[in-house]
Design a protein with these regions (language model features):
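Extracellular/periplasmic carbohydrate-active domains that bind, remodel
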Residues: 1-177
């Protein structure tokens, strides 16, 4: 935790197969008691945060401005996401999954998303305060997303999920897939 910027300029927005080229700003797997607080993240590759199998994850007051996924919460338990701004014009801002990423089925459960702002403004424009809508549409699907979504790649379930007091702007809202 603590103020600072993670600048992922060298990350790719695609799945990386090149040596030394990454596609995630932060990746957590099979962790417990993790807190991410008071950080800014810019141009974060394919995932700003990929959390898989994390128990007791707190994400508080993060500002993310990227062109792909903001937070991917997969097979996690006891997660609190609060007071975050996630701008992700070409993909999902916050996505909850229950995939087979751990090599076993595991639900995503006990998740609270509150007091967050998700959007689909041009990448980088929320971080610099200009809030622009000049970029052409996303090259792979033709529309802005920036939403909160449940279900991508999921084979497990979801239990005890609460989304409260969140603002959705220039995005596709809440999606169930």
């Amino acid at each position: 935790s603590g103020p600072g910027l993670i600048y992922g300029k060298g990350l790719t927005r695609e799945e990386s197969r090149l040596p030394g080229v990454g596609n995630k700003a932060i990746s957590l797997k099979d962790c417990r008691n993790v807190t991410l607080k008071d950080l800014s993240m810019l141009h974060c590759g394919h995932f700003a945060l990929l959390a898989t199998g994390v128990d007791h994850l707190t994400i508080l007051n993060l500002k993310v401005d990227t062109n792909r996924d903001g937070f991917d919460i997969d097979c996690c338990r006891n997660v609190r996401i609060s007071q975050c701004t996630v701008n992700s014009p070409w993909d999902d801002a916050i996505v909850l999954k229950a995939s087979y990423g751990l090599g076993r089925f595991q639900d995503t459960e006990n998740v609270t998303i509150s007091d967050c702002y998700v959007s689909g403004f041009d990448k980088g424009s929320v971080m610099d305060g200009t809030w622009q809508l000049d970029e052409p549409q996303a090259p792979d699907h033709g529309f802005r997303t920036g939403r909160i979504k449940f279900g991508t790649e999921s084979s497990g379930g979801f239990r005890n999920i609460a989304i409260t007091n969140c603002i959705f702007e220039h995005c596709r809202g809440l999606a169930l897939e």
